[in-house]
Amino acid sequence: MTIPEKPQGVIWTDAQWQSIYATGQDVLVAAAAGSGKTAVLVERIIQKILRDGIDVDRLLVVTFTNLSAREMKHRVDQRIQEASIADPANAHLKNQRIKIHQAQISTLHSFCLKLIQQHYDVLNIDPNFRTSSEAENILLLEQTIDEVIEQHYDILDPAFIELTEQLSSDRSDDQFRMIIKQLYFFSVANPNPTNWLDQLVTPYEEEAQQAQLIQLLTDLSKVFITAAYDALNKAYDLFSMMDSVDKHLAVIEDERRLMGRVLEGGFIDIPYLTGHEFGARLPNVTAKIKEANEMMVDALEDAKLQYKKYKSLIDKVKSDYFSREADDLKADMQQLAPRVKYLARIVKDVMSEFNRKKRSKNILDFSDYEHFALQILTNEDGSPSEIAESYRQHFQEILVDEYQDTNRVQEKILSCIKTGDEHNGNLFMVGDVKQSIYKFRQADPSLFIEKYQRFTIDGDGTGRRIDLSQNFRSRKEVLSTTNYIFKHMMDEQVGEVKYDEAAQLYYGAPYDESDHPVNLKVLVEADQEHSDLTGSEQEAHFIVEQVKDILEHQKVYDMKTGSYRSATYKDIVILERSFGQARNLQQAFKNEDIPFHVNSREGYFEQTEVRLVLSFLRAIDNPLQDIYLVGLMRSVIYQFKEDELAQIRILSPNDDYFYQSIVNYINDEAADAILVDKLKMFLSDIQSYQQYSKDHPVYQLIDKFYNDHYVIQYFSGLIGGRGRRANLYGLFNKAIEFENSSFRGLYQFIRFIDELIERGKDFGEENVVGPNDNVVRMMTIHSSKGLEFPFVIYSGLSKDFNKRDLKQPVILNQQFGLGMDYFDVDKEMAFPSLASVAYRAVAEKELVSEEMRLVYVALTRAKEQLYLIGRVKNDKSLLELEQLSISGEHIAVNERLTSPNPFHLIYSILSKHQSASIPDDLKFEKDIAQIEDSSRPNVNISIVYFEDVSTETILDNDEYRSVNQLETMQNGNEDVKAQIKHQLDYRYPYVNDTKKPSKQSVSELKRQYETEESGTSYERVRQYRIGFSTYERPKFLSEQGKRKANEIGTLMHTVMQHLPFKKERISEVELHQYIDGLIDKHIIEADAKKDIRMDEIMTFINSELYSIIAEAEQVYRELPFVVNQALVDQLPQGDEDVSIIQGMIDLIFVKDGVHYFVDYKTDAFNRRRGMTDEEIGTQLKNKYKIQMKYYQNTLQTILNKEVKGYLYFFKFGTLQL
């Protein structure tokens, strides 16, 4: 059937129009992010009903989630109602309003369940079956594995003994059980699980398949060997330009001869590679060599680096791929064959017994849904059954959403009920393989990729492929930068799909033309000497600063009205790969009083209230578990103190269990009577609850504990009470759900919880935040899929990929099967086998490809602006990333395969575009004009150096030191104030021309020049300074008066910031009243008052400087400035080493037309014997002369007026500069 001509003025693009009306063959719509695929899918359904007269219940619409199904059905229903209202006489539309309720718009699991309910007789099962809960399924499978393993322990087959020796430890066989479980889940994701398990042994027995594996490794090795040879040649070329390096060149020439032999004839000679030594040691670079090449120091270092890279690449091939001879690898495969075959037998036994148990309990799980549906739809030979034929006749079209996330079983089910072949079928599939991120759920993106490569745009002889590439979500800056990154990152070799013109994103949203560049911010960690915070904590604080900046400066564009509004909390989302950073972010946002919510399905078991209840349950189940028993005793419920626990243990130091110590203490005549009574009450509770648990279900035991100790009421009254209460009720509800399964009892419930914790399967904190609540959100990339946000902060880019599974002794792969390491039972030594090496390499490639797709999902969530946050320990590593090798339009394959994290690739790609210092042979394009607009990145790269605030560091805290919060005690000249504010907000006019914006605090310049004057080498770096000084103090520190010197300095500055200046001076009583006012306003903490040096402040109030300020014409406090160093130092404009200076001036006052600045100092200093006040004053002036010079010159530069200054030391007095 031909596609109707698109009328003028319709909202659909040409590709969308084709997607709506294409028919007569299978259709695959590759719908890029934000391309409106849901709207297209709904419109296609509607047109099938309106234009083609098809009944809605004769369409099968398969969605990925139940929520998507409900939304889809609602949209279709609304459109039918609108059409029916417009044409009330249309009987067909009236019928559709009735039939919509029976329409098959659902997940595939729901369709399978309906199929089973209608044809249960074919399966010979009880029609009154129920679906097992997750808890029940986990426990039943665990129980089955235990029983099957016990049966095989009774048999003690030699292959089983070898398996247990290889996969179990002396202490447990947990790893063995885990591998069995993984194999079970892998197998049931295939249409024929038994057949898949039977084929696992084939590569171990057949030499033809072993030869294929060796070829696979050889091809992969060629990538690294070629890269190694390139690095070797670069090293040779660099050394060839130098003097006195003949010995180095000789070594490299020998290596080149060896490598030429390996690569001879275009083939990789693996035997020659493994049989010879490569990477001879280069001679040392002596002082004489350095002197002879003093103008080529960088080239010398680069040459050494290239040779080191050559050695590491060769070492990788020899250690990772061919650590042993090919014949030895094949021999190991023969030895492993019986073990692999026996392991498959165990898994088949587990599968059989597990199915038997489920049938006996009359329960089904989701895997049963799929396999029973397939059993109904196929004959024994695999051909479609009569029932399948009837469904083929019934469904006129099958529409599948999120097709990239289907697995092989689901694909087989769909093939049974679709009609025709690809060239004349009725299967409509929509999805985006670049967003296939569910491999851990056995999703198989290769299904999409195979069809994408096979189908054609015109559909001749096969299915039709349609590319939806126009993005209606994001600004063009987000799209072009995303395109640029993936154009150079993703291809068939790494990423599994080519990111070409058909795959890239095209701008389609009606935004205005204002500039909103993507921001790549690289945080360089402060070391332990300069910050008490860990790198992750520093990143969390930095993220908060980005959020504050968005809220203060950014706006959101309303496409409907064409106007802007201010950004709010809910416009911002923080995306990370996992929730590992959640706690740090929660604390950092809490410190700044910014509402923040973690949209988590993790972390539930770590919540204090949940841990308390679980400790209670574990202690009741078995009080001989010391950790949980003592945890319960120390909780808010029983409130035993540490010294009480110590008393108990001291009397019985050799007891195996603390419970025994409690009993012995109660019976000891020397025991403290009060503590004995307390312990008796505690043990009475334990015994009472134990008795209660024998006769009541777990949920009633939990309910009794809640009521007896007012647990709900207590935690509801704490910070975050709503969430805590929800968590407690959530655990109670899970216990009810557990009791509704076929399992019972406290022990089984605890075992179920332990299994969830071990598997990393979490209930998640109960969600008390709605979608419209005005909070900043954090979520994983997985949970953000399908969503969009005005501002996306994609952080955690420097967190390494999780390659833990690659280190396991057994590697699983849907396509290839099972790769098991070889274990020599006699020598008790493990070696990589041919299969484990090959499958590990394949798995690593698939892992990196999926991580790339996660990056794509994250980047394409942003509507207005995208922030990318990376973190490095030092800036030297950035130079290495800038110089990553390339191959054609992509980062070299070897670099991508071994990339440790997303930042590694993203920074390398974007820096190659921006940095002028990168050689042409490492750039993707020599001329920016070569780049098409759709993939020309618009990105600002900032290198940011983290540093904590100290008493000598200029304070940047926005809460107290914002120009917008200026305090003046006098009615100053508003024009002058506006002029000062305008000029102090000066910004470097050529900022758009800079590649890496640079900024230095005045304190840093002070330290820099001090270092230069001392003769020490100091590298001037471009940087931002970030300061945090208002961390929430632990209560025990406040109570013990242990406020640090830098905190006292910050406290004194805060008091001085708000100090009133009166001509009659303020009294000591008024000073106390003023500080009490700061406490009432929550500007300072209540416990901080004792640390304020009242006598020192009173000394200042009684000083001549205070009187001068009080009589001034204007007074301005806490003024930040950002100014070009070139203007201050009178350097030539365009000097590339010039930095932007950033600082904060404590106070400026104007008297008799002259501007004065004041800088407060809380320094402590030693008054050496014999030194006069004049000598001390001179010493202190010298200490801060550079900093003061910059203050004075900066103000004189931007005000164009005479400026004088004062230093005020609380422990010394006034110094006029």
Curated annotation (Swiss-Prot):
<feature type="domain" description="UvrD-like helicase ATP-binding">
    <location>
        <begin position="10"/>
        <end position="475"/>
    </location>
</feature>
<dbReference type="InterPro" id="IPR014017">
    <property type="entry name" value="DNA_helicase_UvrD-like_C"/>
</dbReference>
<keyword id="KW-0067">ATP-binding</keyword>
<comment type="similarity">
    <text>Belongs to the helicase family. AddA subfamily.</text>
</comment>
<protein>
    <recommendedName>
        <fullName>ATP-dependent helicase/nuclease subunit A</fullName>
        <ecNumber>3.1.-.-</ecNumber>
        <ecNumber>5.6.2.4</ecNumber>
    </recommendedName>
</protein>
<feature type="domain" description="UvrD-like helicase C-terminal">
    <location>
        <begin position="476"/>
        <end position="786"/>
    </location>
</feature>
<dbReference type="Pfam" id="PF12705">
    <property type="entry name" value="PDDEXK_1"/>
</dbReference>
<dbReference type="GO" id="GO:0000724">
    <property type="term" value="P:double-strand break repair via homologous recombination"/>
</dbReference>
<dbReference type="Pfam" id="PF13361">
    <property type="entry name" value="UvrD_C"/>
</dbReference>
<comment type="subunit">
    <text>Heterodimer of AddA and AddB/RexB.</text>
</comment>
<dbReference type="GO" id="GO:0008408">
    <property type="term" value="F:3'-5' exonuclease activity"/>
</dbReference>
<dbReference type="GO" id="GO:0005829">
    <property type="term" value="C:cytosol"/>
</dbReference>
<keyword id="KW-0540">Nuclease</keyword>
<dbReference type="InterPro" id="IPR014152">
    <property type="entry name" value="AddA"/>
</dbReference>
<dbReference type="InterPro" id="IPR011335">
    <property type="entry name" value="Restrct_endonuc-II-like"/>
</dbReference>
<keyword id="KW-0227">DNA damage</keyword>
<dbReference type="InterPro" id="IPR027417">
    <property type="entry name" value="P-loop_NTPase"/>
</dbReference>
<dbReference type="InterPro" id="IPR011604">
    <property type="entry name" value="PDDEXK-like_dom_sf"/>
</dbReference>
<keyword id="KW-0378">Hydrolase</keyword>
<keyword id="KW-0413">Isomerase</keyword>
<dbReference type="InterPro" id="IPR038726">
    <property type="entry name" value="PDDEXK_AddAB-type"/>
</dbReference>
<comment type="function">
    <text>The heterodimer acts as both an ATP-dependent DNA helicase and an ATP-dependent, dual-direction single-stranded exonuclease. Recognizes the chi site generating a DNA molecule suitable for the initiation of homologous recombination. The AddA nuclease domain is required for chi fragment generation; this subunit has the helicase and 3' -&gt; 5' nuclease activities.</text>
</comment>
<dbReference type="GO" id="GO:0005524">
    <property type="term" value="F:ATP binding"/>
</dbReference>
<dbReference type="InterPro" id="IPR000212">
    <property type="entry name" value="DNA_helicase_UvrD/REP"/>
</dbReference>
<dbReference type="GO" id="GO:0043138">
    <property type="term" value="F:3'-5' DNA helicase activity"/>
</dbReference>
<dbReference type="GO" id="GO:0033202">
    <property type="term" value="C:DNA helicase complex"/>
</dbReference>
<keyword id="KW-0347">Helicase</keyword>
<keyword id="KW-0547">Nucleotide-binding</keyword>
<keyword id="KW-0238">DNA-binding</keyword>
<keyword id="KW-0269">Exonuclease</keyword>
<dbReference type="Pfam" id="PF00580">
    <property type="entry name" value="UvrD-helicase"/>
</dbReference>
<dbReference type="GO" id="GO:0003690">
    <property type="term" value="F:double-stranded DNA binding"/>
</dbReference>
<keyword id="KW-0234">DNA repair</keyword>
<dbReference type="GO" id="GO:0000725">
    <property type="term" value="P:recombinational repair"/>
</dbReference>
<feature type="binding site">
    <location>
        <begin position="31"/>
        <end position="38"/>
    </location>
    <ligand>
        <name>ATP</name>
    </ligand>
</feature>
<dbReference type="GO" id="GO:0016887">
    <property type="term" value="F:ATP hydrolysis activity"/>
</dbReference>
<dbReference type="InterPro" id="IPR014016">
    <property type="entry name" value="UvrD-like_ATP-bd"/>
</dbReference>
